[in-house]
Amino acid sequence: MWLILLLLSGLSELGGLSQSQTEGTREKLHVQVTVPEKIRSVTSNGYETQVTYNLKIEGKTYTLDLMQKPFLPPNFRVYSYDNAGIMRSLEQKFQNICYFQGYIEGYPNSMVIVSTCTGLRGFLQFGNVSYGIEPLESSSGFEHVIYQVEPEKGGALLYAEKDIDLRDSQYKIRSIKPQRIVSHYLEIHIVVEKQMFEHIGADTAIVTQKIFQLIGLANAIFAPFNLTVILSSLEFWMDENKILTTGDANKLLYRFLKWKQSYLVLRPHDMAFLLVYRNTTDYVGATYQGKMCDKNYAGGVALHPKAVTLESLAIILVQLLSLSMGLAYDDVNKCQCGVPVCVMNPEAPHSSGVRAFSNCSMEDFSKFITSQSSHCLQNQPRLQPSYKMAVCGNGEVEEDEICDCGKKGCAEMPPPCCNPDTCKLSDGSECSSGICCNSCKLKRKGEVCRLAQDECDVTEYCNGTSEVCEDFFVQNGHPCDNRKWICINGTCQSGEQQCQDLFGIDAGFGSSECFWELNSKSDISGSCGISAGGYKECPPNDRMCGKIICKYQSENILKLRSATVIYANISGHVCVSLEYPQGHNESQKMWVRDGTVCGSNKVCQNQKCVADTFLGYDCNLEKCNHHGVCNNKKNCHCDPTYLPPDCKRMKDSYPGGSIDSGNKERAEPIPVRPYIASAYRSKSPRWPFFLIIPFYVVILVLIGMLVKVYSQRMKWRMDDFSSEEQFESESESKD
């Protein structure tokens, strides 16, 4: 069987030092403080590409020679989920310039893997000894702690015969012919489940750093294969796990692969790994042997028991990756590697020091890499910066070079726009190549550099400052072709077009009767995939997503190279499908493409009909005011005459675009004075209350004074009146 289970007995006895280890384990190890001394450095474009350190360990000075080894792509992302369960990309910036690997001078069988982003952090291995090194965070200087990692000798790894292909006892070591050196690249997506996240740091920065250490060590071990493991993306399940993580390893692997098929479609990767924490476990991992490039089986789970060191976990990850490439475990009596313990030795996770691949593993890899099963390792992702130092005049355009035609080539045909002596732009040149460069000058802003290819694409424009014409397209999930299909990565994922691409213009997308009839057979004519046991049965809900079934309306016999064409007459229609040999590089053409509509709000994904919510389409008509569509950055790409960002304002001469387009209009200045004047005219003045109080006090005082004056005058009048009456009375009495 292809399923590999790693059974580890006595694993709880395995010790080592890492931040996540138990205190009991720490007490066994000697920790010392050292100050690394940088003695040499080579830079390119302002960044170190080679560096040498002197490092004192237990009173002896060792010299570390290091070379830059990047493994992060430019679009590397770390994902998590918010409280609503919606996946988000964490806003963290990661440097791809500070990951190094190398060796210790004077020790041929040595290996150094460190990050220099914030001090030195990583592993040193020579002989059968391993050391860990980390910056001393409380130190104001460049002090580091260094410690010897000494895993105790626990029980050996055991393998059940029913689960693993052991190396044939009659295996013969054959000489390997020298081959042309070819670089290979494996892109992996790693998922860290909740308990694992909490165990190794419970902080996104700390956990990310530890995963980087795993990948760095894996790359150093895979160096003899000329294989670079690229961490394409990382995912944390911090609040809750997305699948059940209990149970044995093979069931967990099945659940993870099922989840992967539905939720990792738009995150580029060749393999996906789930890292799970367990207090104790019999198994340390599971994967499918030789299935690295089969998208249905390209995955693995690694179980991290409590006492396992980070270094041992890296060895487990390397063994799982090796098994998925078809490598077998070593027969220790027949396989040698020049160091005490080989990588594919069952005891490798228990050991310290350098572990290398044996001659048996080298031959296994040679067989794998020359087979059709290794096709996913042939593509070369862009890694920046390059660890190779640029040399002007060697005929190769390297990092930070505009041109390099070599001494002879430059003499015969001098390069335009470029100075061959410096490999930089020549005087007066603004650019040298690219769609937005013309005769060494940048094209003007707003000039079309790429027309829309179909309704799922958008037209791009030069921005006047770069020679690059960025590629944008309509957001995945947007309806197309009269709302029958949806857009996927800039193309209308039309079933009609799929059939015409295969069988010509006389073909069309098959009827539902054709799909239901043929994809229910689970044979060469129709199925939902191929597994180790043969053709996979299509459940009723998934039959529109299995083999691509087309209707054919021509009398000409179809002939496709390397493929078998199957005909069927169903309900009066000629239905056709095809079959490629297993492992053929065009075998994916015989399946319905991912993203093809298979029902209301459903699309095909890995031969299953699933809800389309994973596409994340969230662009309604109101967002762009019915005058635009959302692009792949979720910004409105407006129709002609409508201006971004929301397609509300109009300008007759504007051809359409988004805030990402090179023809973005400059924002018009806001009419400040009219706005302020209008604001004051439309509102009555609001005097502060404390300014009104004195006014009222004065009024009240004046009123009081008036009342008092009035009262006094009235009193005077009354007194005068009384005096007159008294005078008159006295006069009358005299008379």
Curated annotation (Swiss-Prot):
The keyword Phosphoprotein applies. It comes from the Eukaryota. Residues 19-180 form a propeptide. Expressed in the testis and testicular sperm (at protein level). GO terms for cellular component: cell surface; membrane; protein-containing complex. The signal and the metalloprotease domain are cleaved during the epididymal maturation of the spermatozoa. Residues 708-735 are cytoplasmic. Residues 389-476 form the Disintegrin domain. The chain crosses the membrane at residues 687-707. Disulfide bonds join C293-C376, C335-C360, C337-C342, C449-C469, C619-C630, C624-C636, C638-C647. It is a single-pass type I membrane protein. Keywords: Cell adhesion, Disulfide bond, EGF-like domain, Glycoprotein, Membrane, Phosphoprotein, Signal, Transmembrane, Transmembrane helix. Residues 184-381 form the Peptidase M12B domain. Residues 1-18 form the signal peptide. GO terms for molecular function: metalloendopeptidase activity. Sperm surface membrane protein that may be involved in sperm-egg plasma membrane adhesion and fusion during fertilization. Could have a direct role in sperm-zona binding or migration of sperm from the uterus into the oviduct. Interactions with egg membrane could be mediated via binding between its disintegrin-like domain to one or more integrins receptors on the egg. This is a non catalytic metalloprotease-like protein. Heterodimer with ADAM1/fertilin subunit alpha. This is Disintegrin and metalloproteinase domain-containing protein 2. It comes from Mus musculus (Mouse). The gene is Adam2.
